[in-house]
């Protein structure tokens, strides 16, 4: 069995570097049956997911990962990944806290794709 923690770390590093630099470049990570829940919007399929991510109302973004937890998931080699962190957008000086969960599945070619992706900002009470 592959080292799920190492795979999760590599995935998260790649995902946020790509998100911060070229959101459209995330398309190969999703499939037509993938689903993204971004705050209150649920989107299925590569085209819809990338349209949502590229239309977010900011130009610059920088993710800072605080925690990363991973577990093997299911009998088909999936990996459940939970990330918490902070992000800065555009010229904002105060970072916003977020949590994001990914369900990664093997693609049959030695890599993984995102089956499920749930993103939520954490607002102070």
From Swiss-Prot:
The keyword Signal does not apply. CDD domains: NTF2. Disulfide bonds: none annotated. InterPro entries: NTF2, NTF2-like_dom_sf, NTF2_dom, Nuclear_transport_factor_2_euk. Residues 7-121 form the NTF2 domain. The keyword Magnesium does not apply. Its main location: cytoplasm. Keywords: Cytoplasm, Protein transport, Transport. It comes from the Eukaryota. One of its GO terms (molecular function) is nuclear import signal receptor activity. It is found in: Cytoplasm. Pfam families: NTF2. GO terms for biological process: protein import into nucleus. One of its GO terms (cellular component) is nuclear pore central transport channel. Facilitates protein transport into the nucleus. Could be part of a multicomponent system of cytosolic factors that assemble at the pore complex during nuclear import. This is Nuclear transport factor 2.
């Amino acid at each position: 069995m592959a080292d799920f923690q190492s795979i999760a770390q590599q995935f998260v590093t790649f995902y946020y570097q790509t998100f911060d630099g070229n959101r459209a470049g995330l398309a190969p990570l999703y499939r037509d049956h993938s689903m993204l829940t971004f705050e209150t919007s649920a989107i299925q399929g590569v085209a819809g997911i990338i349209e949502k991510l590229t239309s977010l109302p900011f130009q610059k973004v920088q993710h800072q990962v605080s925690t990363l937890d991973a577990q093997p998931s299911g009998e088909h080699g999936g990996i459940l990944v939970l990330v918490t962190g902070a992000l800065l957008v555009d010229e904002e000086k105060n970072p916003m806290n977020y949590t994001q969960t990914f369900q990664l599945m093997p693609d049959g070619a030695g890599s993984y794709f995102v089956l499920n992706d749930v993103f939520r900002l954490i607002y102070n009470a």
